Design a protein with these regions (language model features):
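Flexible, compositionally biased loop and terminal segments
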Residues: 1-243
Length: 243
């Protein structure tokens, strides 16, 4: 399939990160419960992966459920977990023809999940481990501070065990102990709903990432919106801290 002419010749990001904000406000505007918005958000995620694959984007990291999201009502948390479980159990029918090309990696803390959820996570990761056209990181019970603390503990353990000299700790060593160690840092972060903050997401990895904010609620974010973000990204000059 030929790319849209607006992005046919642009500098395409290798890795995009997404904070899909606005599901609840989208539902409220329609007189619906939050669960309705989260369900629509799953469909928007499916379309995101489909479009990212079409455009040649290699990595998509999606902030599905943060460590702070446990503070929401019990009914809403259950609805989100049920949607997540349904997605990873039935991803082959939900993602469509692209299923043979997408590798799923679920990152975050799994300690609070039921055995059924953990088993389903392991299943989808195992079934898709050889797919390499698009790597889809799904962040669930994820927090950037927790990720950094966990990486620090692993490095400290290696130093204590004599596997690593403290003077050999570098940016790369630290990055290799993060959940996203197999991926380059995101080139572009997209956040929907008009909010302009990173909310404890990929705190280390976003050091030199370009940010794109849109007023669209996540369920309304589609192909045209992704194209707009990519076009704007391509017009920026990335300096990585230099002049």
């Amino acid at each position: 399939m030929d790319k849209d002419p607006r992005i046919a010749d642009i500098d395409m990001p290798l890795h995009i990160a997404v904070i899909p904000d606005g599901n609840r406000r989208w539902a409220k505007a329609r007189g619906k419960l939050p669960q309705f918005g989260h369900k629509a958000g799953v469909e928007a995620y499916r379309k995101l992966l489909e479009n990212a694959g079409e455009f040649g984007i290699k990595y998509v990291t999606f902030y599905a459920f943060s460590t702070e999201n446990w503070k929401r009502t019990e009914s809403e948390v259950k609805a989100i977990m049920d949607l997540f479980l349904n997605y990873i159990k039935n991803y082959d029918s939900l993602i469509g023809p692209a299923r043979s090309k997408v590798r799923f990696v679920v990152i975050g803390n799994r300690d609070k999940f039921s055995k059924d959820v953990v088993k389903s996570i392991e299943r989808i990761e195992n079934l898709t481990k050889d797919n390499d056209d698009l790597i889809a990181y799904i962040c669930v019970d994820y927090g950037g501070r927790s990720e950094i603390i966990n990486a620090t503990k692993r490095i400290a353990q290696d130093v204590r065990d004599g596997k690593l000299d403290i003077d050999d700790i570098t940016d790369k060593v630290f990055a290799d102990n993060l959940y996203t160690y197999e991926a380059p840092d995101p080139d572009l972060l997209i956040r929907t709903s008009g909010e302009e903050r990173i909310s404890n997401f990929l705190l280390w990895q976003l050091a030199y990432t370009e940010f794109y904010f849109t007023d669209k609620y996540w369920p309304d974010f589609g192909k045209e919106d992704l194209i707009e973000a990519l076009v704007e990204y391509s017009g920026r000059q990335r300096r990585y801290g230099g002049k």
